[in-house]
Amino acid sequence: MCVICGVRPATTADHVPPRGFFKGTVGQFKTVPACSPCNNGSSADDESLRNYISAQVGKQTLGAKYLWEMGAHKSFLRSTKIRSALLSTLQEVEVLNANSSAITRLAFLVPVSLYQRVFERVTRGLHFLHTGKILPADIPVQINLLTDAPDLSSPEFQIFEKHSIAEDA
């Protein structure tokens, strides 16, 4: 049974989270049983989301730089459609810098429905990996965009078990 939709028979294995999010990472990634429409029908969404996340994060860390250079940047160069989707929403916005002075930066609209589709699939896959049970389709998975990055060292996050998704990730 497909752990993503919970309806069709599983005929493939889907990487959870998407392998394309971890460019340069080696090893066997975690997979879950999935039907072909849920797995193969999501490749374009996975690539698009990787590109948006990479464009948001930039090259702040070595991993983010590698993801940009080996993944998102190549996608933007290769595909006019991908490039146009991002650039069509690009606009200048005023933000406050560390000194509370207004400065102009470039911003783009984040396609919330894209995040919803990909992260719902990932959530359903991770639920199966951790519990061995399919999350019923009538249980909603809601994605909320954060205004800033959470402190992952806080006690609320320390209660979660840590698992590797590949050899070096």
Segments and roles (model prediction):
Residues 21, 39-43, 127:
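Hydrophobic/aromatic-lined pockets within catalytic cores
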Residues 30-33, 44-45, 60, 65-72:
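Glycine- and acidic-residue-rich phosphate-binding/metal-coordinating active-site segment common to enzymes
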Residues 31-53:
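Short Cys/His-centered divalent metal-binding micro-motifs
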Residues 47-48, 81, 85, 114-117, ...:
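Exposed alpha-helical structural elements
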Residues 3-31, 47-48:
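Histidine-centered nuclease catalytic patch
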